[in-house]
Structure formats: structure tokens, C-alpha cells
Amino acid sequence: MRLGINASANKKLLLIYGDLIFNVYSIRGISKNGTCVLVDSKSRFKDDEVGVTIVKDKVTMFAYGLEKKWSQIGYFEGEAFDMLKKLCSSKKRSRLYPFEIFNMMIEAGIRIKAVEPKRMTIKEIDSLKDL
């Protein structure tokens, strides 16, 4: 993630995990929402994936064991991008998972909108059986 942030020519980052298959409706217009993550409330992801708590359309926490899931896609811009870049550049945080860094951002006051596009189709590929 740090390499992508450092290579950015502007203060915008679309983060997509590499083991996903999704349709165009999943990310179409994502930048219109400002800093946001895609969430899943329709059991498209396994129970053991990272979930989110949401209050008034904002993510308040990322953690395991939650019903709504983070769809492993996020868009960060402006102040959120700057903080993400700062947190990712720290060597002591290099072993943290992205969702742990997102929680640090939320604790510092960054607002991350939760978005679930109506026509989103998304699937995580863990093995050939998932195709």
C-alpha cells in the first residue's frame, strides 16, 4: 500500500485488494463520495473477514466478528490521504494490516463514509473453487 501511496501524483488513492472479482457498478462514481470504503451487508463475504460498524453512514470501527463486512475496496483523498501516507511511512507500523491503520485514522478524527452500491457484485477469490 505504501508503494502505491508514494507513487501517487495527487492526493487520491483507490485501494483494491488483488483477490477480488467485481462489476463496474461496484466502483463507478466512488470518488463522488469523498473518502469512503465499500461495505457488504448481503453476506457476499465470509464470516471470518474484517467487518465494520457504521453509525450515520460513517465507519466507526473495523474489526473481525462484525456482521457487515468491509469489501476490501477504499477510496482516500485529501486529509485522509495525507494521514494514510503518514501512518504507512512509519517503520513501526509496517506490519499492521490496512484495517488497523484505518482504525487509527478514525480515532484521529478522519471520517470514512460507508458505501454499498445498489448493483454491486463482488466476490473474494481464495481458491480455484471460488471461480
Predicted segments, located by residue:
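A structural signal for short hydrophobic beta-strand segments in well-ordered beta-sheet cores
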Residues: 4, 52-54, 114
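Active-site donor/metal-binding and catalytic loop motifs
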Residues: 116-126
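Short phosphate-binding loop-to-helix
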Residues: 1-13
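Conserved glycosyltransferase catalytic-site signature
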Residues: 1, 20, 95-102, 128
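Short beta-strand-to-loop acidic/aromatic patch adjacent to the donor-nucleotide binding site
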Residues: 11-21
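Catalytic donor-sugar/metal-binding loop of nucleotide-sugar-dependent glycosyltransferases
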Residues: 103-117
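Short acidic-glycine loop/turn motifs at beta-strand connectors
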Residues: 53-58, 107, 118-119
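Conserved core of the sugar-phosphate nucleotidyltransferase
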Residues: 22-92, 99
